[in-house]
Amino acid sequence: MDDELRERVRRAAERAALFNALKHGSDAQVGAIMGPMMGEHPDFRAHGDEIPGVIAPVIEDVNGMSDDEQRARLAELAPEDVEELDSEDEGDDHALPALPNAEAYDEVRMRCAPNPNGPWHVGHARMPSVIGTYKQRYDGSFVVRFDDTDPETKRPDLDAYDQILEDLSYLGFEADEVLTASDRVETYYEHARRLIGMGGAYTCSCPGAEFSDLKNSGEACPHRDKDPETVADEFEAMVDGEYNSGEMVLRVKTDITHKNPALRDWVAFRMVDTPHPRDAASGYRCWPMLDFQSGVDDHRTGVTHIIRGIDLQDSAKRQRFLYEYFGWEYPEVVHWGHVQLDAYDVAMSTSTIKERIAAGELEGWDDPRAPTMQSIRRRGIRGAAVVDAMVELGTSSSDVELAMSAVYANNRDLVDDTAPRQFLVRDGFEARGEGPEESHEAVEVPVDDGPDEATPQVHPEHPDRGDREIPVGERVLVEATDLPAAGDRVWLKGYGPVRYDGERFAFLDADIDIVREEGVDVVQWVPAEHNVDVRLRTMDGDVTGYAEPGFADRDADEIVQFVRVGFARVDAHRDGGASVAYFTHP
């Protein structure tokens, strides 16, 4: 990052921190401003790993100001931001906008309706993050409904049902009610029969292309005026599985001349020859389309507010015809834009990830390169860090991009205080796929005249947690890039300053002022004779190296910080093999 860009980052951070602090009446946090700042300045994203360190002092300065000082400074930088603050309702400190007409309902009831055709990718976390936050805000209810009524095109994955609920729990939410649409097929049949009795639906055997031509020209197909008795008989034949796939559908009778062809006599039920993978639903061949199934379920389960993609606006319009037939009141709807994700080379698509796994290009859903919930969990990213970043995106109808650096900043705030420090000396890199090459090499150097043991702190901010005891021995390992020129000094962290003569380190003394006053580099190291082989799995490849001996005592799932490398989750210690850790973030 050059000086000009650094100054732009500082100025943008100052403005964002001032606005955030004044809006919420509390100290600004790095994680809270990273997402919006990255969204407003896309050119910052390439430097996402550096930005937290650049903006942290700026935010600290802002937090040290009084409210009046913050307001005056923001007026200098961005008077329009002050106007926006003045126009907002006093005391409204929510990241999300108020739900429409929430006060008109006894209880706000929202649903997350995943298709269980595979485990969740990171983008799937947006819906439960926002709905869960609204539930807390309005003391409402959170319904999870598995929309699994397409056994062919988006075939359900039997493992995904439980995996999705586990991901929901990881994010910090529990559903008040869990429903599975394929358990409710008889309910959809009942409503179809009612609709047929009203004259609101008809069976149609037109080939798809033929009906499409008629629909686009605003002409009714010859089946539209069938009497309800014939329609009822043919629908029962559909239910009994007497038609093959594509031979018969049930259509909702709307307006065949509607200005939007997508709303003209849409399909409510179709025949599917492929059995459902769930035993309880495997006998059905007549399946509702999502707009019919979802519309019925939203009413039957008392949903008051729906959040769905901007591309699904026609779904609401189609369902309103259904609601008018039944005399139901349609829920409030918020349409939002799509969310994109930076930092990954793999597309955020369930089908694409499945294909990459099947082809052997990914090792599984928890591969560090996969943009999936299982992957970020295994890396040690807390669910709350994801939720906060998703909520900060809001519910705008515009497409948004989630900067993973914002998730990392949130997570750093959550884990930094508790993560014990450890030394890791890297000594190799195994690239996976087309990831960038890295070069790491450990160098063994004899040490003369120093203490037998080093005692670095467990955590530099918490001296009360004690020290780590690391036996030094006769030789240490350092990374080749940290080796100084002959005659120069370095500070072996937790041990002391040494001078390198081109072959050996000679211990000098333990005066920390050498580092503070003379700019001596501080480097991590491990004893050459007493260390732990480590394989650190990253998004780009596997880093091999050596950790200090105490790493062997760290529990699986514990988050540590490898000094000058980054945070990592301890995955497993293996007898006779390397311990495995997953790189979390810098």
Curated annotation (Swiss-Prot):
Q: What is the lineage of its organism?
A: Archaea, Methanobacteriati, Methanobacteriota, Stenosarchaea group, Halobacteria
* GO molecular function (one): glutamate-tRNA ligase activity
> What is the designated name of this protein?
Glutamate--tRNA ligase
Q: Which InterPro entries match?
A: Gln/Glu-tRNA_Ligase (IPR050132), Glu-tRNA-synth_arc/euk (IPR004526), Glu/Gln-tRNA-synth (IPR000924), Glu/Gln-tRNA-synth_Ib_cat-dom (IPR020058), Glu/Gln-tRNA-synth_Ib_codon-bd (IPR020059), Rbsml_bL25/Gln-tRNA_synth_N (IPR020056), Ribosomal_bL25/Gln-tRNA_synth (IPR011035), Rossmann-like_a/b/a_fold (IPR014729)
Q: Provide the reaction this enzyme catalyses.
A: tRNA(Glu) + L-glutamate + ATP = L-glutamyl-tRNA(Glu) + AMP + diphosphate
Cited NCBIfam families = gltX_arch (TIGR00463), PRK04156.1 (NF003169)
Can you tell which superkingdom this protein's organism belongs to?
A: Archaea
Q: Name one GO cellular component term.
A: cytosol
Q: What are the start and end residues of every segment in region (Disordered)?
A: 431-468
Q: What is its main location?
A: cytoplasm
Q: Name one Pfam family in it.
A: tRNA-synt_1c_C
What's the top EC group for this one? ligase
> Isomerase: is it a keyword of this entry?
no
Q: What is its EC number?
A: 6.1.1.17
Q: Give the family per the record.
A: Belongs to the class-I aminoacyl-tRNA synthetase family. Glutamate--tRNA ligase type 2 subfamily.
Q: Name one GO biological process term.
A: glutamyl-tRNA aminoacylation
Compositional bias, Basic and acidic residues, is annotated for 431-443, 459-468
**Localization (cell):** Cytoplasm
